[in-house]
Curated annotation (Swiss-Prot):
Gene3D superfamilies: 2.30.30.30. One of its GO terms (cellular component) is large ribosomal subunit. The keyword Isomerase does not apply. One of two assembly initiator proteins, it binds directly to the 5'-end of the 23S rRNA, where it nucleates assembly of the 50S subunit. Located at the polypeptide exit tunnel on the outside of the subunit. This is Large ribosomal subunit protein uL24.
Amino acid sequence: MPFTASAQPRKQRLSLYAAPLHLRRKLLNAKLSPELQKKLGVKRLPVRRGDTVLIMRGDFKGVTGKVVKVDLKRVRIFVEGATRTNSRGQTVYYPIHPSKVMIVDVDLSDKARQKLIERRKRGQHGSS
């Protein structure tokens, strides 16, 4: 989904930085595990609080945990197990970009999310 028709990198970056929150949700897409891809029929979904993810890159590579918080403004997620100690000695969650995680368990309690999956599944099968 292009935010701008321009191919210029500066305009691409600007459109990402200036994107409204309702469009930033699309930037939170993360890949699904191969088992979930077969089960649900889609390749990626926006990450939500309650999903279980596996961190694929960075210092916390290999850590699996539930998503505790999603920061739309900064396009980052916070995962149980990915923590650090701040200067006050408190344990805080480390922000992780959603492209660096893989969803291993999806929270399907929301009917709107189930409709999204059905809609995307139809779109993928219709185009082939």
